[in-house]
Design a protein with these regions (language model features):
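FIC/Doc superfamily catalytic core
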Residues: 1-201
Length: 201
């Protein structure tokens, strides 16, 4: 059964295709309009704006805090009763060095504030923080899917793996359209969305 959506789609495979197509196009608009650079780096309100921009044509809940508890495998994300407090604490975390930025990213992943689309939104949010803080972004096309997912799974206990993995993929090409497009495709590939190439939408 598909998640309730504005498109009236009840088939989950069909919804996944449309979600990929529409939200990838929205990601391109975010980049090309310069809207990403206008958001305050590292703030939850900025993550909300990114999430809303990507998914507002598909879901009613975009940018809104989830109303259910979420888990992935054996890992439970921040319980609802602590979610708002967790987000307040994340906003206050420092973000002036690479390590601080990744630690903030890991905490936001644990918070998982939205019902759907957390990973894709948060990777854009991370790059925006890196760009503002250290003048670099992640070239996601250089980050292996299995290595990334495993490192993120372990990151709540030990964040050294995700730091090493992402540090090795940093690039100074912060305004490169090609790096951004490839990054979107890889970000979606991590979540199993591989039907469309961003460049062709």
């Amino acid at each position: 059964m598909a998640l309730e959506n504005k498109l009236g789609i009840t088939n989950s495979a069909e919804l996944a295709r449309e979600e990929e197509r529409i939200s990838k196009r929205k990601a391109v608009e975010l980049f090309e309009s310069g809207a990403l650079d206008k958001l305050a780096p590292g703030r939850f309100t900025s993550l909300q704006a990114i999430h809303k921009a990507l998914f507002e044509d598909i879901y009613d809940f975009t940018g809104e805090l989830r109303t259910v508890n979420l888990a992935k495998g054996n890992f439970r994300f921040a319980p609802l009763m602590y979610l708002e407090a967790a987000l307040g604490n994340i906003d206050k975390m420092p973000q002036s060095t690479f390590d601080e930025i990744i630690e903030k990213y890991v905490e936001m992943n644990i918070a998982h504030p939205f019902r759907e689309g957390n990973g894709r939104s948060t990777r854009l949010w991370l790059d925006q923080m890196l760009k503002a803080g250290i003048g670099q972004v992640v070239d996601w096309s250089r980050v292996d899917k299995e290595d990334y997912l495993l490192a993120m799974e372990r990151s709540p206990i030990k964040d050294v793996e995700i730091k090493v993995l992402l540090k090795a993929a940093l690039t100074d090409d912060v305004n490169s359209r090609e790096v951004f497009m490839k990054g979107i495709d890889h970000s979606y590939y991590y979540e199993g969305y591989t039907t469309f190439k961003t460049e062709e939408l």
